[in-house]
UniProtKB/Swiss-Prot annotation:
It catalyses: a di-trans,poly-cis-dolichyl beta-D-mannosyl phosphate + L-seryl-[protein] = 3-O-(alpha-D-mannosyl)-L-seryl-[protein] + a di-trans,poly-cis-dolichyl phosphate + H(+); a di-trans,poly-cis-dolichyl beta-D-mannosyl phosphate + L-threonyl-[protein] = 3-O-(alpha-D-mannosyl)-L-threonyl-[protein] + a di-trans,poly-cis-dolichyl phosphate + H(+). It holds the Pfam family TPR_2. GO terms for biological process: protein O-linked mannosylation; RNA processing. Its EC number is 2.4.1.109. The chain crosses the membrane at residues 21-41, 111-131, 138-157, 161-181, 198-218, 222-238, 314-334, 355-375, 382-402, 404-424, 439-459. This is Protein O-mannosyl-transferase TMTC1. SMART domains: HAT, TPR.
Amino acid sequence: MVVTTSARGGGGDRTPSRRRGCGLAPAGAAALLAGASCLCYGRSLQGEFVHDDVWAIVNNPDVRPGAPLRWGIFTNDFWGKGMAENTSHKSYRPLCVLTFKLNIFLTGMNPFYFHAVNIILHCLVTLVLMYTCDKTVFKNRGLAFVTALLFAVHPIHTEAVAGIVGRADVLACLLFLLAFLSYNRSLDQGCVGGSFPSTVSPFFLLLSLFLGTCAMLVKETGITVFGVCLVYDLFSLSNKQDKSSNGALCPRSPQQPGSPQPSSLPGHPHRENGKQQRFPHKGAWGGCHSPLPPEPKSSGFPVSPRAVWSMMRFLTYSYLLAFNVWLLLAPVTLCYDWQVGSIPLVETIWDMRNLATIFLAVVMALLSLHCLAAFKRLEHKEVLVGLLFLVFPFIPASNLFFRVGFVVAERVLYMPSMGYCILFVHGLSKLCTWLNRCGATTLIVSTVLLLLLFSWKTVKQNEIWLSRESLFRSGVQTLPHNAKVHYNYANFLKDQGRNKEAIYHYRTALKLYPRHASALNNLGTLTRDTAEAKMYYQRALQLHPQHNRALFNLGNLLKSQEKKEEAITLLKDSIKYGPEFADAYSSLASLLAEQERFKEAEEIYQTGIKNCPDSSDLHNNYGVFLVDTGLPEKAVAHYQQAIKLSPSHHVAMVNLGRLYRSLGENSMAEEWYKRALQVAHKAEILSPLGALYYNTGRYEEALQIYQEAAALQPSQRELRLALAQVLAVMGQTKEAEKMTNHIVSEETGCLECYRLLSAIYSKQENHDKALDAIDKALQLKPKDPKVISELFFTKGNQLREQNLLDKAFESYRVAVQLNPDQAQAWMNMGGIQHIKGKYVSARAYYERALQLVPDSKLLKENLAKLDRLEKRLQEVREKDQT
């Protein structure tokens, strides 16, 4: 800790000494600052994409991998939506988006490198701030170093640095400072009398304009650097001359302590919240408890409710100024989201919190008056610059002049905190001047302890930002009365399958904010009782009639209840109010396809792909539709597009594999199945690959695949049944029998188990048991006539093996009655009649079978045998007649 002090003496108020030397070389100071920044934020390198990062990077069509570099970046907002769209956040930050794109181009979607860039930028801002304070504020390297050190470790910066989307604030701040320094460099710092400072370096002036424009394109509030430069000019207009000891006026060197202090006014960042569209609130007022009161039904009130509401809003917003200052002074309670009940409304002038507002107003007024008085005496420019740095960047976020989409946002304090740090260090320096040596030492030790405490708090805050779970859980712990944090944590728990916990937090959110339509909607999705779920969806729609997800969920619920026309209406409304909601297109098109309204379904899919071109699920579902409607070649392109949009879309890969399998391209099918397994080693991917191996006679590979699948999902009956079937084909009938009987013991109504047991017993030549298994299957009374036909056909085969030809014939006859296309049964009936010497009926059965399978060689051979027999019989008859 290096603080310059001067001895007390007569003559009243003294300023701190302006000595340049502080015992610390610039390189050493820079190294210490960079080291402190890295130590505080190094933990964030292990973090993942959390909160707004998901919407700004992972789900942003302008940023995510595979998305081409297009001009849309300069026409879309920070989240990838067109600036002209009603749903756009109107946050225009194309250069920040380009840095995300560059990150992905160089290092992929690894969050480590995103966090590394943020830390590097924070280090650079800290170093440039030290340089700015050294050259234009304190003109004292020691004080500049302490200011930058306080800035480097302040916990309020955690959201801006540890949260990847905070790069907009950090990078804009860096460009802001560089633009201001360039502008300062372009001015004539010499004596200019009563005129504006003249420009001596057009290059630095143009550079300042360029850097300021870049700051604006990184984050909108970067434009305020131009206003800062104008204010700097205004304060540079007067007092450019200093009185010498003999009263003469002389030009003042830029390095003189009394020179006017340029003020760097970083632009105020506009907080973005990627989840705002999933949570209804009215701008900044959304963080307060009370909704807008209704208009009075009578005019008997002495004071208009509108006037009362305006007063409440003014008092609350004024208090929020004091609250933000308190976060800078004592960053004890920090949270990623301060909306929906975090800060109750200041409803009356008697609210004790108004004292904080009044105190802040008095302090700011006194400081301003002090600045004006000191400015005329060419003293205490640090206070002036500190106030400008603190106040100007925060004006856009104050809600006093226009509304912004948040109540309190920690990352918007990144730039204003520079002013706080300057004022803090200046005050520390003044106190050291006034105190004796013992008091000054105590103050310095206390400041060191404060810096250590801030550093510890910053490290702990970084741990909170490591994952979605830790971030959302911390919100619930920090602000348990905030409905939004309960809602966000419930969403995370829902995604993790922890439904009971999710339901609890959704209900807590509703207790705190009963008008939370999205919480009602999500609660409905977790409710098993359809009547209760329907009630939640309807309540959500009462609160928000255009809630497209509630319309979607209610439509799907009615679809499951066979109320298809009502479902279609709701799904169409969901699309109407959420034209970029891809799931609604898929659900509506699927419902229309079920009703064989294929043309309408096709139109819905086409419209959906037009409005949601980046939806991989929509392309995949359209591919399924095309396969079902007999257009497999066209489906290939959409499956491939789904995979292109989402390289980890294993469902599309499996569907593409199945399609190639149906087209007979087994090698391509196998390739896509294996690619899907590289993405996700799941049983539902192993199963079709095992079926491919089984159906192509590669039984050893099929056995291995099914064993892996059964190990992943040992409770899934179909996988164990398929494994038993492979074992039976490979001759391991005992093991297959044991496995199948075990499944039957768990589920006595397993029809396929009895069919497989029949095949196993038949392979063991135990036809009695095989016949018994088929009879048990028939006792289950399956509803599908084709399945019953197959069972009677199998029963006929077992009876035929036992030489019970009449009973076998009867079973075959029942089989063809249920399924006249059962060619094998017709042929077997012909064979029985053939054996029994009933050649005429045998021929009739053979010919019926041949109509179904005209290329059957076996049938043709049997008919040829029958022809020869009939010819011999004819010859015998002719001989007998002669």
